[in-house]
Amino acid sequence: MTEKSSNDPINKTATLRLAQTDMCKGYANGSIGIIVSGLIWLISATISYQYSAKQAVWTLLIGGMFIHPMGMLLSKVIGLSGTHTKGNPLGNLAMEGTIFMIMCLPLAFGLSLQHAEWFFQGMLLIIGGRYLTFASIYGLKLYWILGAVLGVAAYLLFYFKVQSFGSLLTGSAIEISFGLLMFFSFRRDNLNG
């Protein structure tokens, strides 16, 4: 009988890849959450257009609390688990990223007290930075591109003094586009694999 001793090397690459595969299968590469987030940005854009930027700030903040539960629900509707295996260490990384993002919200809200549109541009930077960690969580380098696109968009929107409605539409379009790309990539890979 051969048992592994604590001195035997662990194949960390294989272990990480298994954890990433588990995350990908549970959340369709994270695509469902991105699409839900993009739809919340679109709803906020509508609120900004119909009512005010201040109400759109609250719509995005409150709506953002429902991204994960709505993503889980939609994942289950399309036949996915909508969750990851208990004990998957990447679940902890996802939670830590969420907590960091929540800790950044007061900064974005403070920006809105100066200029309402700065809130949305700040949020694009915050979520763009958060998506960078998703490259490790899901093992998909496309998240680096998503994070960079959101970050560059935030800077350009700020530089060109784009108002709230335009910033919200930009965030929505970027997230929905990337979310759909990731979803169809997930479907292709899982229908063929």
Tell me what each language-model feature is:
Residues 143-193:
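Terminal transmembrane helical module of multi-pass membrane proteins
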Residues 104-151:
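Membrane-proximal helix-loop-helix units in multi-pass membrane proteins
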Residues 72-86, 129-136, 179-188:
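C-terminal ends of transmembrane helices
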Residues 37-92:
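Selected alpha-helical membrane-embedding segments in polytopic membrane proteins
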